Amino acid sequence: MNDSLLSNGHAPPLRQATVDRQTKETKVHVELTLDGNGLADNHTGIPFLNHMLDQLCAHGLVDLRVQASGDTHIDDHHTNEDVGITLGMALDQALGDRRGIQRFGHFVAPLDESLVEVALDFSGRPHLNYGLQIPTQRVGTYDTQLVREFFVALVNHSRMTLHIRQLDGMNSHHIIEATFKAFARALRMAIALDPRRAQQIPSSKGVIQA
């Protein structure tokens, strides 16, 4: 059986979403295609965040376009958080009722001396267990506290449970990049369509909600 086909022999609908979000602090536009090829066009005004989003595309095989502007003359906090919010909203919309997905994902990614484990569940119940110990306050101009803020925003608006655990690492850039790579691969597993499940909701309750 072709894994890309439903039980009725038809291809599944394209899973994608476009979300625009604007506040007095930021303006964010996100286009997301889950069944993509890793295409990335990310311009957030925060170079390091662009780099991490590119990793998400390359290793999660999602297509992602993010255009963001904000009050980065103050600091990166609002833009970083609002990109996470808008991406989470797009992910939630693209997944719909979660029908037919694997739902769970888990991956351990090494990057030189760093090793990060990520497990996630599209449970409908937002929860983040964040276990990174990043040794420096900044990577270039990027405030490393914003890594957690990005994932908090993403988790809350995609309605996922996410565990991030640092198993090893000393270099801040390596730790963060390993995190995004592990997240990307876990995401790729979780959003994959399960041909054995066809169009069923992946829950014994028959519904996934908060």
From Swiss-Prot:
Catalysed reactions, semicolon-separated: D-erythro-1-(imidazol-4-yl)glycerol 3-phosphate = 3-(imidazol-4-yl)-2-oxopropyl phosphate + H2O
Name listed for the protein in its UniProt record: Imidazoleglycerol-phosphate dehydratase
Gene Ontology molecular function: any one: imidazoleglycerol-phosphate dehydratase activity
Keyword Ligase: no
Region spans: Disordered: 1-23
GO BP terms: L-histidine biosynthetic process
Matching CDD domains: IGPD (cd07914)
Predominant place of localization: cytoplasm
Family that this chain belongs to: Belongs to the imidazoleglycerol-phosphate dehydratase family.
Record-linked SUPFAM superfamilies: Ribosomal protein S5 domain 2-like
Pathway: Amino-acid biosynthesis; L-histidine biosynthesis; L-histidine from 5-phospho-alpha-D-ribose 1-diphosphate: step 6/9
Name of the encoding gene: hisB
Gene3D superfamilies linked to this entry: Imidazole glycerol phosphate dehydratase, domain 1 (3.30.230.40)
